[in-house]
């Protein structure tokens, strides 16, 4: 076996970096002057070419990520194309340095350019941050595509025509003569009647760039070109942007490891991708007035308020009286996050583990790790519970493990069996959840599970589940509200019935 020396490896990396640097001059970069931008809308085909500070890097990236998450959460509960969505999203966009609606465009070109620049930079930063796993790539591509689709549908035809001037593929608007020559074919293929078609705007593009429309059967094909109406232009542009994104992120991933910015840039990129799914930290600190959780309450809590991942590990612990390291860490930090004290956590694990091993062996082999998670050993830093992103993207389970995310790490049939064991979900609800998991929409699958388990309508929760402890907290809120409502109805005085005069 031949090993490459450290010096040779360093030289290899330098050679690759030199090659990348030499290629940069052939890459077209985004405009750096206000007069150069073709229109404030863009399809993100040219990366930014100016320098920014780390402070601006953080500010722009986090602003865009928060906006995309707000967009996703709202889209999950309100139809994307109705007025309610527009009104609610407009309020969420207040103060955002990005043109989302046409009437937000400033009067001065310099101001437009600054917003355009932040739009461009934010998009490409997130590309870098989310290029390292297929799940992250797919999430960003989908949400950026939906966001662009929403923005394009707000615009007039003239604005979209201006945006077409800045695309890197050929797309042409049909002239009057060409349109009239094939008007009957266009009517038939695009399902317009005789009076509608002459007043419609049509475009043509290489058929390879219209696969989505061809699949739907809504285009006219002729000599390698696809002809389609203006109504489908947005589909073409969004599909092209998403394809470009996926290809670009795959290339970025190959070069990310040899960047000279490891000390400053890569930690920031990791933070962005991790924060895409996680909200607040669950470190076990409970607000005043919270219910004290004890080990004797866990069985009942697991049945009604645990996410499937935690319920799976809890049941495994009760049946097998043991958890492997990955499950002990994932489940242990979750229990810490819901407020289980260190003493209660040790007592709970000892009760189960000592059904197979001695108490001394438990103390020697497992007690230290529990105390470590609570910040009482080692570095003495209290650890926080794992978010869904951490569970999904790190330390995937083997066939004999019980940790991980059931929606991500279970085969479809196995997942359906697990969901069926709850005996609460209906068959069609299980199918719905399994379909979302198969589409890699794990957060939506878990959210639907939550809603069905709590007798809510789809979208009734009003947010996406992105953390097992969030699942627990939201469940406990609903349970508390329903108990309070029941008590209130029982305490209400019975209506007084007047005695009727029968005389």
Swiss-Prot record:
Domain of life where this protein originates: Eukaryota
Species this chain originates from: Caenorhabditis elegans
Subunit structure: Heterodimer of a small subunit and a large subunit.
Binding-site list for [4Fe-4S] cluster: 309, 388, 405, 446
Function comment: DNA primase is the polymerase that synthesizes small RNA primers for the Okazaki fragments made during discontinuous DNA replication.
Name of this protein: DNA primase large subunit
Biological process, per Gene Ontology: DNA replication initiation; DNA replication, synthesis of primer
Similarity section: Belongs to the eukaryotic-type primase large subunit family.
């Amino acid at each position: 076996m031949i090993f490459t020396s450290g010096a040779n490896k360093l030289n290899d990396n330098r050679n690759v970096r030199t090659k990348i640097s030499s290629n940069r001059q052939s890459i077209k970069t985004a405009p750096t002057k206000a007069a150069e931008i073709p229109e404030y809308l863009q399809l993100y085909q040219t990366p930014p070419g100016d320098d920014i500070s780390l402070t601006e890097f953080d500010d722009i990236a986090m602003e865009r990520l928060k906006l995309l998450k707000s967009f996703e959460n709202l889209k999950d509960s309100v139809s994307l194309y109705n007025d309610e969505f527009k009104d609610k999203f407009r309020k969420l966009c207040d103060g955002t340095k990005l043109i989302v609606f046409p009437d937000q465009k400033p009067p001065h070109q310099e101001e437009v350019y600054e917003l355009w620049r932040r739009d461009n930079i934010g998009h490409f930063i997130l590309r870098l941050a989310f290029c390292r796993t297929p799940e992250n790539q797919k999430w960003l591509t989908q949400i950026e595509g939906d966001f662009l689709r929403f923005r394009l549908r707000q615009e007039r035809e003239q604005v979209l025509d201006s945006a077409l001037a800045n695309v890197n593929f050929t797309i042409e608007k049909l002239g009057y003569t060409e349109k009239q020559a094939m008007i009957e074919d266009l009517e038939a293929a695009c399902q317009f009647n005789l009076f509608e078609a002459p007043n419609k705007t049509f475009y043509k593009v290489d058929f390879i760039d219209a696969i989505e429309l061809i699949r739907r059967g809504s285009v006219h094909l002729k000599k390698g070109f696809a002809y389609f109406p203006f109504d489908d232009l947005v589909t073409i542009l969004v599909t092209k942007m998403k394809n470009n994104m996926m290809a670009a992120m795959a290339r970025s991933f190959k070069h990310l490891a040899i960047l000279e910015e490891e000390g400053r840039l890569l930690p920031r990129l990791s933070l962005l991708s991790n924060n895409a799914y996680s909200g607040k930290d669950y470190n076990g600190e409970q607000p005043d007035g919270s219910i004290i959780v004890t080990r004797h309450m866990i069985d009942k809590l697991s049945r009604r308020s645990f996410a499937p991942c935690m319920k799976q590990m809890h049941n495994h612990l009760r049946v097998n009286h043991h958890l492997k390291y990955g499950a002990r860490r994932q489940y242990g930090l979750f229990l810490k996050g819901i407020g289980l004290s260190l003493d209660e956590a040790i007592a709970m694990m000892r009760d189960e583990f000592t059904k197979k091993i001695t108490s001394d062996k438990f103390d020697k082999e497992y007690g230290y790790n529990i105390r470590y998670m609570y910040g009482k050993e080692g570095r003495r830093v209290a650890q926080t519970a794992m978010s869904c992103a951490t569970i999904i993207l790190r330390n995937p389970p083997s066939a004999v493990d019980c940790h991980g995310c059931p929606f991500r790490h279970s085969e479809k049939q196995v997942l359906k069996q697990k969901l069926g064991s709850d005996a609460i979900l209906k068959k069609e609800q299980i199918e719905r959840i399994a379909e979302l998991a198969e589409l890699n929409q794990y957060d939506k699958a878990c959210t639907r599970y939550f809603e069905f388990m709590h007798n809510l309508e789809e979208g009734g929760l009003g947010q996406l589940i992105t953390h097992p402890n969030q699942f627990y907290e939201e469940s406990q809120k609903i349970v508390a509200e329903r108990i309070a409502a029941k008590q209130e109805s029982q305490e209400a005085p019975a209506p007084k019935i007047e005695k009727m005069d029968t005389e």
